[in-house]
């Protein structure tokens, strides 16, 4: 009985220690999440404006033509896979990888992994990678996103692949994060976004609209990648906060059950001792 009580007490201390860790991780994630949300929200107007600029160029010029805005016939794809650097975030990374697997079924594709987990996943599955230079999502800067965009656009123009897709986790709310695989290039739908403009070619582009368009696309892609990185970081922190909150609650419930078990064992031990004392006294 005493040995059993000692084991329960050690288990309680172990669970309490784990609960302190999960609670601390929950608080850290909550603190970082607010800044990550603000950064993600600040990014959105930038690439929305860039997208509208591209639409205006494509729609406003009858002689418009760009390698970035037409199908090349090359069905090979490149997925920019944005995952986290660490685990302990529930199904955050696993759900993203399932999204990639569903999107890439029966396809010939390359991967540009961003984040430690994305690099590890790509290596483990033997995916061909454009580069593995961005293994820490926490260290990805705006300059890094421009570097990635220029690399991808260069390979796209050379015909290494005919499509570029972003595979990341969209931040919806504190309790909802949505893995998504969205096509980025070619921008073939721009000219389909007609809005009944009756006056065209009011803006003159030098040297011409197509060259301006081709110069803007890498910046647009860099903005999309950076926005997706910000959304992914916010999603990872939200998922980790939720997971650690659930772990803390589970630990509290377990401690309550263990304390109840310990108190019952202690009560039984005391009752047994009293019975033995009474029995001994009666024997005398």
Predicted segments with their positions:
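C-terminal beta-strand-loop-alpha-helix "lid" module of Rossmann-like NAD(P)-dependent dehydrogenases
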Residues: 1-284
């Amino acid at each position: 009985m005493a040995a059993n009580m000692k084991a329960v007490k050690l288990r309680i201390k172990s669970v309490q220690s784990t609960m302190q860790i999960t609670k601390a991780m929950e608080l850290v994630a909550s603190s970082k999440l607010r800044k990550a949300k603000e950064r993600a929200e600040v990014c959105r107007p930038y690439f929305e404006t860039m997208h509208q600029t591209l639409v205006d160029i494509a729609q406003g010029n009858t002689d418009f033509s760009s390698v970035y805005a037409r199908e090349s016939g090359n069905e090979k794809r490149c997925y920019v896979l944005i995952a986290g650097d660490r685990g302990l975030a529930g199904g955050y990374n696993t759900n993203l990888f399932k999204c990639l697997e569903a999107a890439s079924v029966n396809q010939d594709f390359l991967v540009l992994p961003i984040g430690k987990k994305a690099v590890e996943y790509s290596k483990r599955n033997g995916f061909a990678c454009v580069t593995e230079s961005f293994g820490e999502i926490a260290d990805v800067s705006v300059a890094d996103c421009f570097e990635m965009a220029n690399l991808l656009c260069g390979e796209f123009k050379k015909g290494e692949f005919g499509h570029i897709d972003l595979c990341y986790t969209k931040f919806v709310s504190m309790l909802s994060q949505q893995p998504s695989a969205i096509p980025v290039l070619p921008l073939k739908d721009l000219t389909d976004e007609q809005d009944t403009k009756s006056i065209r070619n009011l803006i003159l582009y030098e040297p011409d609209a197509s060259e301006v368009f081709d110069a803007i696309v890498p910046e647009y892609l860099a903005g999309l990648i950076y926005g997706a990185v910000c959304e992914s970081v916010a999603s990872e922190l939200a998922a980790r906060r939720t997971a650690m909150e659930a772990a803390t609650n589970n630990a509290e419930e377990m401690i309550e059950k263990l304390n109840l078990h310990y108190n019952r064992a202690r009560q039984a031990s005391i009752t047994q001792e009293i019975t033995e004392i009474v029995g001994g006294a009666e024997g005398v």
